[in-house]
Design a protein with these regions (language model features):
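Conserved helix/coil segment N-terminal to the catalytic DExD/H
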Residues: 140-178, 192-197, 368
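Walker A/P-loop
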Residues: 37-58
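Conserved RecA-like P-loop NTPase helicase motor core
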Residues: 330-461
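A conserved SF2-helicase RecA2
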Residues: 243-250, 405-498, 504-508, 513
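Conserved pre-motif I regulatory segment
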Residues: 8-43
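Post-DEXD/H (motif II) to motif III coupling segment of the RecA-like Helicase ATP-binding lobe
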Residues: 188-249
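Conserved interdomain linker/interface between the two RecA-like ATPase lobes of SF2 helicase motors
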Residues: 232-305, 310
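Conserved Walker A/P-loop ATP-binding site and its immediately adjacent core
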Residues: 52-56, 61, 67-92, 96, ...
Length: 523
């Protein structure tokens, strides 16, 4: 008997599909850690397959216990619940597991065509999953009715809820069996006061928290994820560097962009449209094997509205660039090339264009696409505002997904993760327009950014690109990029150089005497 047979135990129901065969070894470890504990945190970078882990946890419990069980998958945003349901549905269908599903939020139903395609394919592969309508609503009576139907059919029921609406499930559940498992996606949101109470109101036998970055508070009895009573222990951690070494993320590079005549905040406000266009075009020039697909984090919805009405936007569209914009603002909504579309249509076309190697994209958002949305193909991000640590890591994660062909070749052993010159997408770029005035806040923002990127193996001497540099340059030329930055943006360049000195000193301070001699003098 293998180790995972021991961990996952004897199954109540049998299937000719091993649900764990499709998981990577690190995902199996995370699932095993969750199964061995009733509560805890799984912390892994964006793009490493946390939803697969959630799906496997649910599938394992269904196979072991079968029959009528209640599961809840929570997320901070409505749009993310749609993506989560699709992935969980696909995983369970492939495992030949029939279940009932319901959304608990105000966003309405999703287009079920994609789910039908998944169901039909699973049935062609030997499953026997009948069509069933996906429920949706926040009315307690409707939720309770769905629970009753699942119980009568003796089928597992999986709710996909926003944090805002999750307590309605507990209200509707009264009189039925307890919730078996609660899975909280983007769980760092639960630190916020408006959501934290559901940790206590939504009762379950088992509860897990998934995030790319944990948030702690000064007190280990407060709302932070360092409160073990609320969140349990950290069950599994994968660092960004580990994800890169496994080929599940790409390396970051900073691209400081020089835009003529734009150097301070006032100029920024007057020249935003030019900044976006020039930055995009300079980014395109440094790419050698892929076309640019850039995610822009706007300062506010007004910036997005102004850009969509600008000459620069029209010029980019004439040049073949598709312009996507999304915000909760009704005037923006879900916008593709100036046309309002449904949320589902927006996400469907965005995913399709993200995979299309012949497409150029600019996607502007304000606080919408940062969390967990499955859009691949971004070549870089353009943060036009200072992001919190969690927001930055989530936003960068949107562009850090490897190219599909690169991932396949790494998985098959055709190339390794250090064969950067053989990859279509060896790096994800963080584009910094030259709107810094060199004041203390600007310097602090750059220092904070580089400090966060250290977890990704970022080296300021090697991973900064100037306007006329391309990826794949030699080490000597990489160093010249920092010198170029010092010439064009002296305040920022000197700040980075000084930070590098501090980082090197910190690194050396951690070395033993023998390690230091070897590192410094080769002896």
């Amino acid at each position: 008997m293998g180790i995972f047979d021991k961990i996952f135990g004897k199954k109540k129901q049998t299937s000719d599909v091993n649900i764990f065969d499709k998981l990577y070894p690190y995902q199996k470890e995370a699932v095993a850690s969750a199964i061995a504990n009733d509560k805890g945190i799984v912390c892994m970078p964006t793009g490493t397959g946390k939803t697969y882990i959630q799906s496997a946890i649910i599938a394992d419990d269904i196979i072991k216990n079968g029959d009528f069980q209640i599961y809840v998958v929570n997320a901070p945003r409505i749009v993310l619940t749609y993506q989560l349901l699709k992935e969980v549905y696909g995983f369970l269908a492939e495992a030949k597991i029939e279940a009932r599903y319901m959304f608990v939020h105000s966003g309405g139903k999703m287009n079920e065509k994609e789910l039908e395609d998944i169901r039909i394919k699973a049935n062609l592969d030997g499953a026997n999953i009948p069509f069933s309508e996906i429920g949706s609503g926040t009315n307690i009576a409707e939720i309770r009715e769905m629970i009753g139907k699942a119980k009568k059919q003796n089928l597992p029921l999986i709710f996909f809820s926003t944090y805002h609406s999750a307590e309605r499930i507990e209200d509707a559940r009264v009189g039925f069996k307890p919730i078996s498992i609660v899975l909280n996606d983007e769980a760092h949101y639960l630190v916020q006061e408006q959501f934290h109470d559901i940790l206590h109101t939504l009762k379950s036998n088992r509860c897990y928290f998934f995030t790319a970055t944990t948030i702690s508070t000064p007190s280990d009895t407060g709302r932070g994820m360092n409160n073990k009573e609320s969140y349990g222990d950290v069950l599994y951690v994968m660092t960004p560097r580990e994800a890169i070494d496994l080929g599940k993320m790409v390396r970051p590079r900073l691209h400081f962009v020089i835009t003529d005549g734009v150097y301070n905040t006032d100029d920024y406000n007057n020249s935003l449209n030019k900044i976006i266009k020039d930055t995009f075009e300079q980014h395109e020039r440094i790419l050698t094997k892929t076309l640019p697909k850039v995610l822009v984090s706007a300062k506010g919805t007004q910036d997005i509205k102004n850009f969509l009405k600008s000459i620069e936007c029209r010029q980019l569209m004439r040049d073949g660039v598709s312009i996507y914009a999304v915000a909760s603002n009704g005037e923006i909504g879900n916008n593709i090339n100036g046309e309002q579309v449904s949320r589902e249509e927006f996400l469907r076309r965005l995913k399709t264009d993200g995979l299309d190697v012949t497409r150029k994209l600019i996607v502007l958002h304000y606080d919408i696409l940062a969390e967990g949305i499955d859009v691949s193909g971004f070549s870089g991000i353009m943060p036009l505002r200072t992001l919190s640590k969690s927001k930055f890591l989530q936003t960068y994660g949107r562009s850090a997904r490897p190219d599909a062909e690169d991932r396949r070749k790494v998985d098959n052993g055709e190339i390794n993760v250090d064969d950067l010159e053989l990859m279509n997408k060896p790096y994800a770029y963080i584009m910094i327009p030259s709107v810094y005035s060199g004041n203390d806040d600007d310097k602090a923002n750059v220092v904070q950014l580089i400090t966060e990127l250290r977890d990704y193996g970022f080296n300021p001497n090697e991973d900064i690109v100037g306007t006329d540099r391309i990826h794949g340059i030699s080490e000597e030329e990489q160093l010249e990029s920092l010198n170029e930055l010092k010439r064009n943006l002296p305040n920022i360049g000197e700040t980075i150089e000084n930070l590098q000195v501090v980082l090197e000193a910190e690194k050396h301070a951690k070395l033993s005497k023998s390690e230091l001699l070897k590192n410094q003098f080769g002896i």
